[in-house]
């Protein structure tokens, strides 16, 4: 995410009157509270529930190089490391960028790896250039597959990926890590997207557009990945590793241009969350700086044709979508990174849409910059990660 992308997590004050009105309505509707499960994580961006009932959490990293991590959380909030040392570095907007979305299928965990330090801010606001120094990892802007047994998940105290093995993965090798006690994990590169493409601007020809994989979902032998930097969804053939663009989302007019100093005349789409429903893909579009309310949407994508139609409109910084089927009917949980005004100073929300046309019910308004959500149906708990390092639990029985 560059200055007009999801990587920018800047805060700014917003209209007090609008905030009071919106949050009063939210408080009247919200029926759930956020119970902290854990804090102190390294900026968690992705979660997935394993078939052992544990919550797997991707942590994009700290200011330290290669501090990306996958953690295992039990229902009591006890944390163990599954894999540390994943690629992570400070990106072009001075934020850590590393592991992002997770998707678990059987005993294979798919992990999106963000853009890292591939780019740097250009000399003109809103521009990006290639990093003039050496990029710290050859597998930024990629997807990894991590295989591990149920016993390893139950007993491991953690593995660390050596820096040298990042190059081995880039070269197409499968990396096996063992702790000497019979536990091991196997890691392979599923897809390595172009780090960037040329994107010349009339006033700055060297400008580039960065690839920034964010969330992902698998359907049969295809993996679909949102890219918040390139404003598209990738499709990956899991049998061959080949990938192509399924759909690209165009920019829209910025309704706050000339009113809020930040941002240009148009808003990038910034696709974030992705899920499947009725053989279609649902993708949240976060939208770019200054993140105006009402411009964020959930899009419905036909995976056979790439046809894109708006499914839920009028949102604010939608970052995840979760379809829930009950008695042959489907309702939709939408996670908003913030609720009112430009930027992110307002609380995040979980909204429940019985119909795409709304209006939604506010499930929870007790969130601070949430990033993703995972439902444990058996426990009746919705887990939500927050950018500041927390995972919270929200009671939710569909």
Predicted regions and their residues:
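Residue-level signature of beta-propeller blades and closely related beta-rich strand-turn architectures
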Residues: 61, 115-117, 229, 287, ...
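Beta-rich, blade/repeat-based domains predominating
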Residues: 40-54, 67, 88-108, 140, ...
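Short, solvent-exposed loop/turn segments at conserved positions within beta-propeller repeat blades
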Residues: 62-67, 120-140, 228-229, 290-295, ...
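C-terminal segment of classical bacterial N-terminal signal peptides
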Residues: 18-29
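Residue position within the beta-strands of beta-propeller blades
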Residues: 56-58, 110-113, 225-226, 282-285, ...
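Beta-propeller fold detector
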Residues: 35-38, 78-86, 153-194, 244-258, ...
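Short loop/turn segments that connect beta-strands within beta-propeller blades
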Residues: 73-78, 147-151, 237-241, 301-306, ...
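A short loop-to-beta-strand structural motif that recurs across blades of beta-propeller domains
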Residues: 66-71, 142-144, 232-234, 296-300, ...
